[in-house]
Amino acid sequence: MKIFFSVGEPSGDLHGGNLIRKILQRNPDIDIVGYGGPRMASAGCQLHEDLTRLAVMGIVQVLVHLLSFWKLVSRADRYFRHHRPDAVVLIDYPGFNWWIARRAKAHRIPVFYYGTPQIWAWAPWRVKKMRKLVDHVLCKLPFEEKWFRDRNCNATFVGHPYFDQLQNESLDNAFIEEIKNKNGPLIAILPGSRTQEVKHNLKWFLKAARIVRDEVPTVRFVVASFKSSHADWAQNLIEQSDLPVETFVGRTPELIAASQCTMACSGSVSLELLYHQKPTVILYWVPKWFYALIKSFAPLLQFRVKYMTLVNMLADEPFAKRLRLLDSDWNEWGEIPFPEFVTSGDKSPQIACHLIRWLKHPEERERCRKQLHSIRAEVAHGGASDLAANYILEILEGNPPPPPTPHFLDSQSVAVIPEMALTK
């Protein structure tokens, strides 16, 4: 048996590596090949290309690398034609993976989407594409299963793979104690894992840090960098700010554990912050032109999610009855766990306001921690990789579905997985 993986994000590489290990534990004779990153390679995947090096954001960056993406899609198509795998597993990275799914369906290869793109948030009309191109949707979030099933997609909730990693993670406790034992409260700054995110977010976080420092002179700051190039860029910015900020590479879990509170880029890191129950302010910054575009077309885009942050979605009803307003300020204490700002402007004063309150009023920090503890008890369970691996192999080995439906047939023609298979 052979399974082809297509993964483009660093976080997807992590989850793909864990899933591959579980698949090979159950059946060591399976060949795992495809596109991914170093963690998938170390788990036993024969990489055709390190796709994580092309993890880009924004239309401009996509256009710059368009030829590279097209060559990789064509290469996958040739592989499907000459070495037909038994299944294709996609993780995140929708812009590229839709094309991989289309090629797989053209060759009648079953497609599994593990860690589906959040189309329910930003592009609900794309569920038609999901229905045509994907045979099995493995959902990370509890409300996703119902959302996809209501739209005639084969979907089952397996849990979020991020919690698998967090439960198995071993922290450097000596490093944590060393950081914590220095004088003054500690705020961790998490600007993101992509270069564009770091460049967009860090300047606003440092501006907020300056405001916090003026109110709480003993406060210290640490920046968690995903890679050395990010740390070098951050260090240049920090030197200009004249703030007490240290930068570390590959120490995100320890820095989160050691901090009193954090400011972070919107993304899956919010689940790690939930796991460690850290009060956090979330920034989702977008360029002005993109902000104007989204705001202008919001009615057409049916942009009805109430929040941008996963933890806030898990804490409340994720979908709004009316359109979500961009740039809204969540200043009501206790309304949501993580105050969030979706903006193209400067929200550093608002970000600082929350951090100052948490530092000056421990009871507010404790109230937020209790709220996070309650959410964690409900959703932060491991086992997603196990469930996903078992589901995929049961379908391929023990409960094979009918031949995959060509992508050009309508939703009424798509075969539904037997209920027994969905509940296993």
Which residues does each predicted region cover?
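Nucleotide-activated sugar donor-binding and catalytic core shared by glycosyltransferases
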Residues: 1-424
